Amino acid sequence: MGRLAAAAETRWAPLVVAVAAVGVWWLQAVAIPLAGGRDFATYLGAYSELFHSDPIDLGYVLGRTPLSPLVVGVLLDPFHGALAEPLMSLLYAASVTAWFLAARSFGGAPALLTVAIVLLYPGYGIVMHELSSDSVFAIAFAGWSLLVVRVLRSPSPRGFALVGLGVALLVLVRPGNQVLLVLAVIPLLVSARWRTRLVSSAAFVLAAVALLAALTVHNGVRYGDYTIARGGNTRLPFERAFLTDRIVRPENGPSSRELARAVRRELLPQEPYRSYGVHLDDFFSDPSPRMIDDLGALANRKWGWENDARILRDVAIEAIRTHPGTYSRGVATTVWDLLHQPVFRVLYSGGDARQNSGAPEASGTQDTIVIGGRTLPRPTEGQRIPAPHEGGPTSPDGSIYTVWTSPIEHHLVFLRSADEERYIALHQRMDELRANVPDRAGNYTLALRLNQASRWFPPPVLWLVLGIVGLAVRRPAGMLALVTPAVAALLVIVLDALAIPSVPHYAVPAAPAFVLLAAGSLAGPRPATVRMPP
C-alpha cells in the first residue's frame, strides 16, 4: 500500500488514472451505450433554440440554464454524433481525475481509495452514459470540488473569486445550484486575518453574482424575461407539496382557495378532465404530473406571464404551514432515499439496453376504463388524464394553444402561420439530434449485471457516515477543504428533497464528495503536533 500511495503522488499518476477511466467507461459502454437520459427532449429543444433570435418555445430556453443543453448538443451535433461516445469517455475520465487530484491534496492513500471507489461505482458509470444535466453536473461538480480543495489548502481572495465563479457555472448547469451561494460563508472560516476573510467572501459573492447577473440581463434582453430560469415556483416547494405529500387543499389559505376557484372554473370543465370525471376533490387528492403542467399554464394565463406562477409558491407555503409535519417527514424520507437508493439503467425485455427514456415499462393492465358509462382509453403511467389540457409550447402572448376535439384527441392551434412553420422546424431539428444518439443495442445481460452491481454497491450514506466518524476520531489535517465538497453535495440533495420526490440521479453526481470525505478523514494525515519542552 505504501508503494502504491507513493506512486499516486508522482507526476504521471493523473495520466494513468485518466487512461484507466477511459477504459472503464468503454467497458461499461459494451453493456450500456451512451443514451438519452432524464428529460432528454428538453435539452435537445433548448440546444436547438439557443441560437435562434426568436425562439418558438420559451419553455426550452428559459426553463433550463444553458450549459447542460449546450454540452448535450455539442456532443451530438458534430459529425452526426460520431464523436459523442469518445468525447463522453474523456469527460468521464476528466471527472474521475479531478476527484483523484482533489483527494491527492490529502495524500497518496486517500487518492488511491477515492479513485478506486469512484471507478468501481456502478451508479456513477450509469449516469455518465446518459445525456442529461445529471452527467453534465457530475463533470462540473468534480472540477469545482477540485478547485475548492486547492483554494482552501492555500486560501486567497483570488482563489475564492474563482470558487464563486465556479458556483455560477454550476447554476448554469442546473438552476437549483443557486443554493450553493450560501457557501460564501466558507472564506470566513479559514485561518487568516479578518480583513482577508471578508475580502475573500466578497470576492466569492461578486464573482458569482456578476455571471448570474449577466445571464439574467441576457434573458431579459433576448427573451423579455429578466430571470435566471423560469419554472422554479412550480417546483420548489409546490411540486413536492402537491404531487408527493399531497397536502395542497383549498382550505389551506386564501391563495389556495383562489387557485381552487380557477381550477374549478377554467380547467375542470375542459377536456380531458370533463370526460375523465376529475372533480375538484380528485384534482387535489389524486394529483399527477400532467396536472402540474396545466397548473403552470393556468397560472401564467390567469395571473400573468411576468409572475412566473408565483401563486403556486404561495399555495405551497400555505400547505406547508398547515401540514408542517407531513412535509418535514416527506423531505427527511426523500433525503434518506437519495443517500441510499441506487441508480439503475432502464432495460427492455427485448434485450435492448440503449435508451433510458425514464418511462416505465408497460404494466400489462387493461387498456380501457369506464367512466360515467363511457369506455375510454386508460391514461398511461397510472395518471388520471391522458395528457395535459395545455401541452404545447410556452408562449407569453397565448398565440399557441391546444384545442381538444374528443376526450383523447387534441391539436395545436397557431394564430400565426409562421409560428407553426418554426415549430415544425424545431421538432425536425430535435429529431435530427435524437437520431445522432449511438444506435448500438448494448448487451442486455451485462447491463442487468451492472444494475445488480449498482444495487449492492455501498450507498453514498455509508461513505458519509465513515467520513463523519473519521473526522470525529482522527481530526485529519485540512478538515475544511475535506468537508466543503461534502457540504455542497448535501446542500444540493436537501434542496432536491424540498422540491421533488426521490430521484437517485440527482444525488449520484455529487456522491464522490462523500467518498473523498471518507478517504481523506480515514487515510489522510493528522495535523502535526507541537511537543512542549520538558
What are these regions (language model features)?
Residues 9-14, 79-83, 301-302, 310-312, ...:
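Membrane-interface anchor segments at the N-terminal boundary of transmembrane helices
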Residues 35-38, 42-44, 48, 204-311, ...:
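Juxtamembrane membrane-water interface segments immediately following transmembrane helices
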Residues 12-15, 99-120, 138-139, 153, ...:
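Transmembrane-helix signature of polytopic, membrane-embedded enzymes
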Residues 38, 63, 84-91, 116-148, ...:
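Multi-pass, polyprenyl lipid-linked donor-dependent membrane glycosyltransferases
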Residues 9-38, 207-219, 490:
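Transmembrane signal-anchor helices characteristic of membrane glycosylation enzymes that use polyprenol
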Residues 30-45, 58-71, 79-82, 228, ...:
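Extracytoplasmic catalytic/substrate-binding loops of multi-pass membrane glycan-assembly enzymes
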Residues 160-174, 207-215:
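Membrane-interface alpha helices of multi-pass inner-membrane proteins
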Residues 72-76, 84-98, 137-140, 454-465, ...:
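Transmembrane alpha-helices of multi-pass, membrane-embedded glycan-processing enzymes
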